């Protein structure tokens, strides 16, 4: 298990075989992947360096609280990125992602000592057998609460 000190750590994961996936081998409602990622404050600082987003609400409690936030928040794009990773792992090729959209509904608070655990469940939301495209719906939660709304990934199954 990765404690998240080097980056978002995958704590557990599962997916159906991504061998030769076609729309005819899937059903709406089927779970295709699930994962948990641990985030630490170190992850946030490293992500800030990679992204260039050094807003101190992502690493300083005093600044976050001074602007009315309950604590340090994970970067939205970091949350969005880790949320799609189980789908990329399942489909086997990031180039098969045709579209990815989310709504940010709640922040992920990253405690200085305990960090945060983000849970992702990916299910088939719709299938188009003519184009061999699937819509994968993501349920992304932190502390049992959904943090990304209408998180959907369109993937090519060809």
Task: Give each language-model segment a name.
Residues 1-6, 11, 18-32, 110-158:
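HotDog/MaoC-like acyl-thioester-processing domains
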Residues 11, 16-74:
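Catalytic strand-loop segment that frames the active site of acyl-thioester-processing enzymes
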Residues 34, 40, 44, 59, ...:
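Amphipathic, positively biased hydrophobic alpha-helical segments used for protein targeting
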Residues 39, 104, 155-157:
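Hydrophobic residues in beta-strands and at strand termini
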Residues 51-52, 64, 98-100, 116, ...:
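Short, charged/polar low-complexity linear motifs in solvent-exposed/disordered segments
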Residues 70, 79-121:
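Hydrophobic beta-strand-centered segment that forms part of the acyl-chain substrate-binding groove
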Residues 74, 96, 130-132:
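Short loop/turn segments at connectors of secondary-structure elements within structured domains
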